[in-house]
Design a protein with these regions (language model features):
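Active-site clefts of carbohydrate-active enzymes
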Residues: 73-104
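Solvent-exposed beta-hairpin/edge-strand motifs
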Residues: 196-213
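Glycan-recognition and catalytic regions of carbohydrate-active enzymes
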Residues: 129-177
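Active-site groove signature of glycoside hydrolases
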Residues: 1-11, 34-40, 44-58
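Substrate-binding cleft of secreted/luminal carbohydrate-active enzymes
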Residues: 104-134
């Protein structure tokens, strides 16, 4: 179901969704909602997957952090029923958007929604027109595919902690490695961040920064690193 929370009545859409769920119980049903529909529980959120289309480039002045916060809103709405969260992010949509995302914006919004709990991403509407945007789509999807087992790992680990609120992060353990995926979610401000590692990484002397061909020292179970606006770092630590 596409965007019906703007053009239909909740009580009309809910039985439509119920009928599809009953007819094909093993095919996931989702409704591509707006930011109005999900907190308003349009059609009682009668879907297997929560999904949102709210675009960074549909008007001027929007920030990547808005996409991240919207993902968190979806995650909270579906948490009790353990519904996965998908996001229809801005891709090439120049017929009704004023521009495409920049290279930095596309990488940041893709990483940002995953860090916030998103487990499915698609890009609206078609392949990028701008070369740097196309390059970003190729890069970020290669990276997220390489991190798929990490992101979905259920191995227990306490999270790394980062005091700066501009840095959004995810901590995962996979086998004998600890992963910290960290993003400066601010469009404009550079950040010097201190990352406090969980006790399992206390003996580490360094961390690989995946996809960047560099290492950073670990001192007193802490990493100090710089983040440009919208920059992501993926730290890998041997345990």
């Amino acid at each position: 179901v596409e965007g019906r929370d703007l053009s239909a009545k909740s009580e009309e859409v809910e039985p439509f969704l119920e009928a599809h769920l009953a007819a094909s119980p093993y095919t996931p049903v989702f409704m591509n909602n707006t930011k109005i529909g999900i907190p308003g529980r349009f059609a009682n959120l009668k879907t297997d997957i929560l999904m949102l289309d709210d675009y960074l480039t549909n008007r001027e002045g929007r920030k990547v952090l808005e996409m991240i916060d919207a993902t968190q809103m979806m995650w909270e709405a579906g948490r009790e029923e353990r519904k996965p969260v998908f996001y229809f992010l801005a891709g090439e949509n120049l017929h009704n958007h004023y521009r495409e995302p920049t290279h930095a914006e596309q990488i940041a919004q893709s990483y940002g929604v995953v860090i916030a709990g998103c487990r499915g991403i698609s890009y609206f509407l078609s392949l990028a027109t701008y070369p740097e945007h196309y390059r970003a789509l190729v890069e970020v999807n290669r990276e997220l595919l390489a991190l798929e087992d990490v992101v979905l790992s259920l191995e227990p680990t306490p999270p790394a902690t980062i005091a700066n609120p501009l840095i959004r992060s995810m901590t995962r353990r996979l086998g004998d490695k600890l992963y910290i995926i960290a993003l400066n979610a601010d469009n404009d401000q550079a950040v010097e961040a201190e990352i406090a590692l969980p006790a399992s990484a206390r003996a580490a002397a360094s961390a690989e920064v995946k996809f960047e061909n560099r290492k950073v020292p670990v001192e007193n179970a802490r990493i100090l690193d710089a983040f440009k606006p919208l920059e992501r770092h993926v730290y890998v630590i041997d345990l």
